[in-house]
A protein has these predicted regions:
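N-terminal segments that cap or nucleate solenoid repeat domains
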Residues: 2-65
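Arginine residue identity/basic-tract feature
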Residues: 3, 22, 43, 56-57, ...
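Solvent-exposed loop/turn tips at the surfaces of repeat/solenoid architectures
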Residues: 30, 35, 40, 53, ...
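Surface-exposed loop/turn motifs in large extracellular/passenger domains
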Residues: 44-51, 67, 80, 92-106
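Acidic/polar low-complexity surface segments
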Residues: 70, 74, 80-94, 126
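Long terminal segments
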Residues: 94-141
């Protein structure tokens, strides 16, 4: 139990360091490449969502929840991301307070760390095919 506690403490220290702001990220930029980004740096005010952005070879660090709709996740890796929420098409657009919403964004060769993913049902099923060990939690109306 003590070793497990030490491991979790070390992980937290590491993630805090990696996610600290060493450079200024402009959340209004259209393209991000080769950046280490604390997910909170991408949050926009008043429930606005990120739209039509491209992320290439970025490391996106939580803790955070990211809803990715109408986008693309290609050749990306997920570390300590836990379960994935799958949104049924019958729900329509959901208002997810505290969640960073990405609409029509592309994530190419990125690393997600400590980030909960919320995906449309089709995207979640594709993710499950590529990563069978992933647990998908379905959200329906």
């Amino acid at each position: 139990m003590y070793r497990w506690s030490q491991l979790n403490s070390s992980k937290k220290t590491y993630y805090d360091y990696m996610g600290s702001s060493r450079s200024t990220i402009n959340p209004l930029s259209e393209n991000f490449a080769d950046e280490i980004i604390n997910m909170e740096q991408l949050r926009l005010p008043a429930l606005q969502h990120q739209e039509n952005k491209t992320f290439r070879r970025c490391i996106l660090i939580g803790p955070s929840a990211a809803a990715i709709f109408d986008g693309e996740i290609r050749d990306s890796v997920f570390f300590d991301c836990g379960d994935v929420f799958s949104m049924s098409p019958t729900i329509g657009m959901a208002y997810l307070n505290g969640t960073i919403v990405f609409k029509n964004c592309r994530f190419i060769d990125c690393k997600f760390i400590n980030t909960t993913l919320i995906l449309p049902e089709v995207a979640a099923n594709l993710l499950k095919q590529n990563m069978p060990e992933t647990k998908i939690l379905k959200v329906t109306r």
